[in-house]
Regions:
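N-terminal, cleavable Sec-dependent signal peptides of secreted/periplasmic/extracellular proteins
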Residues: 1-202
Length: 202
């Protein structure tokens, strides 16, 4: 019998060729950027929210910096965070680093004209809205509308100028849920909008 007569060949593990070398797959990094109010405006300070995910869509820890600027940042929770940035050029890039691997991403292009709108909590039941427009748009009366669950909760006006204009909005009586602030002119043109989650104290 051939199989019984054939000699047994023993190969030591160290002598065996490695036919399938172990390779480490580079982690795919995705990053999305969301200027507060929807737009980056040249020479106007803006907060930029971001989210960093892997190839499965899950948020991951990361650090980053704006190329050519002394601006660094890191994720806070589930791959999300924010940084403050004043664009001086139309196009800017951000470097995101995850586990020692760095990728470069484009920020949304900065626009030459428009408004930057920021929304911050003020006490336990109010928010303060700040609006800062470019020179050619100053001196206009703009509308500010607050909706929650698709219903109008508040409406008022704000006067735009070179310095940020402010308006305080009470959230008393506003139900818990996703709210949205809209900035628009007398013709109904929407310049900026911003969502936030309101947690009712009732």
């Amino acid at each position: 019998n051939y199989y019984e007569a054939s000699p047994v060949i023993t190969i030591k593990r160290s002598d065996a060729p490695e036919f399938r070398p172990k390779t480490e797959k580079l982690r795919k990094i995705n990053a999305s950027f969301y200027p507060e109010g929807g737009h980056l405006i040249l020479d106007k300070e803006c907060r930029v929210a971001f989210k960093v995910t892997d190839d499965t869509g899950f948020g991951i820890d990361a650090t980053g910096r704006v190329e050519g600027k002394d601006i660094t940042f890191s994720t806070v929770h589930d791959g999300m965070g924010w940084f403050t940035f004043t664009p001086k050029e139309k196009s800017s890039k951000v470097q995101i680093t995850v586990d020692g691997t760095t990728r470069s991403f484009d920020l949304p292009q900065a626009e030459p004209f428009g408004y930057v709108m920021t929304v911050d909590p003020l006490g336990s039941d109010s928010i303060i809205v700040r609006v800062n427009g470019t020179q050619g748009l100053s001196g206009k009366t703009l509308g500010l509308g607050l909706t929650c669950r698709g219903e109008l909760m508040d409406f008022g006006t704000i006067e735009s100028g070179q310095a940020p204009a402010e308006r305080i909005i009470s959230l008393r009586g506003v139900p818990e849920g996703v709210c949205r602030i809209y900035l628009f002119d007398k013709n109904g043109i929407n310049y900026s909008s911003r969502s936030f989650y309101h947690r009712s104290k009732v």
